[in-house]
Amino acid sequence: MKTVPTLSFSKLGCSRGGRQLFQNIDCVLESGHWLYVAGANGVGKTSLLRMVCGLAPIESGEIFWNGTPIHAQADAYRQDLCYLGHLNALQESMTVHENLAFTAALGGMAPDMAQTQSVLAHFGVAGRDRQLVRHLSQGQKRRVALSRLALSQARLWVLDEPFVAMDEAGVRMLADLIAAHLTQGGLAVLTSHQQVDIGAIPAQLLELRA
């Protein structure tokens, strides 16, 4: 049985080019909650998210997943994390199905064809699974990226400006997807320049200041 997931920061700090972006950040995020990382451009929001994803070194302090430093459980932590940014991060030379299967493999899962077809239909890209991503429109690519998020079994979602260039229907679709993830006991960390409404689930605010 899996433990109830918890993400925490202890005295977390980051600098860039000799300039301190943030320091002494303490935070605890528990199952069913989401963290809204706010702040002006250049204060380190993306740097913080990259540290949470393990893509940037932790300069000071520590990030814990279920009470253990993330660097001490890198493989297991990676399987429990799914990232979505303003870019879709899809392999253009692969089919939609291959992209989704690759993501499933990273999470230690085998792709479920019936579930994949159902999710693609839900996001309005049914019948596109054998199509090369390069032949999709930008809107279709974004919906494939959302499908990948929906199919993920990861308990921690890290979302960097996920609503950029999305129409109203897409924004609502993603917000509902995040809300469902939280209701099922997941966690989310996100940053956005747009107003974010995740249903009845209030944000836990972390505001970074220059």
Curated annotation (Swiss-Prot):
Its EC number is 7.6.2.5. Its main location: membrane. Disulfide bonds: none annotated. It is an enzyme of class 7 (translocase). SUPFAM superfamilies: P-loop containing nucleoside triphosphate hydrolases (SSF52540). It is found in: Cell inner membrane. PROSITE patterns: ABC_TRANSPORTER_1, ABC_TRANSPORTER_2, CCMA. This is Cytochrome c biogenesis ATP-binding export protein CcmA. Belongs to the ABC transporter superfamily. CcmA exporter (TC 3.A.1.107) family. Keywords: ATP-binding, Cell inner membrane, Cell membrane, Cytochrome c-type biogenesis, Membrane, Nucleotide-binding, Translocase, Transport.
